[in-house]
Amino acid sequence: MAYSLRLIEDQLAAGAAASTPRAPRVLYAVSGALLGGEATEPVPAVGPADLAAHAGSAGAVLYRVELVRQPPPPAGGRVLLEHPIDLAGGAGWLMRCDRVDFEPGGIAPPHRHRGGGIRCLLRGRLEVTVAEGAPRTVQPGGAWFESGREPVLAVAAAERETSFIRVSIQPASIRGQSSILYVDPADAGRGRPRRYTVYVDEPIAL
């Protein structure tokens, strides 16, 4: 079975319901308030287990990341990025949403991940180099896909903080654990001027 991961922007009016999931998905509030299920307090993100979610009284702009079978169903919003993802041979999967915050000049040394995912820059600037490719400069709103197999080097803007949101499909066996694998294992013990905030880390059924 062929799958793709896609990033969609949804603009919701005040109190409007978010898209009902037809596939495993994460919703992240870019602006405005997002409320999951019967909750009365806003949350940064909701995961696949939250079947109902809606915007707050001022509306909301959401990033929706879905894992869809090919051919994909209608998106129902503005598709910012869609990329095939290889899920062959897995014994079980989870959907993870986290935010990565770099201090000015922060660097993520060459690394891989245990699964693929989509990233979207929220603020700052990030120079991303995948394998032997040319560096790519990503600005706020820019999205990219990492398979997890190729080594990636990321360098944040020197003059300001940089942040991106990430939704990835990881082996279920690493729930609650980091997915990162450094090309040079010594980098794992060196200073890392960046912070991770995990919002969603839920098993999914394909």
For the regions a language model picked out, list residue spans one by one.
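Short acidic-glycine-tyrosine-enriched beta hairpin
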Residues: 9-13, 26-56, 102, 130-151
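Short, conserved beta-strand element in jelly-roll/cupin
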Residues: 22-36, 113-128, 164-171
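Ligand-binding loop in jelly-roll beta-barrel domains
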Residues: 22, 48-78, 148-177
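A short glycine-rich, His/Asp/Glu-containing loop-to-beta-strand
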Residues: 1-25, 30, 65-68, 75-106, ...
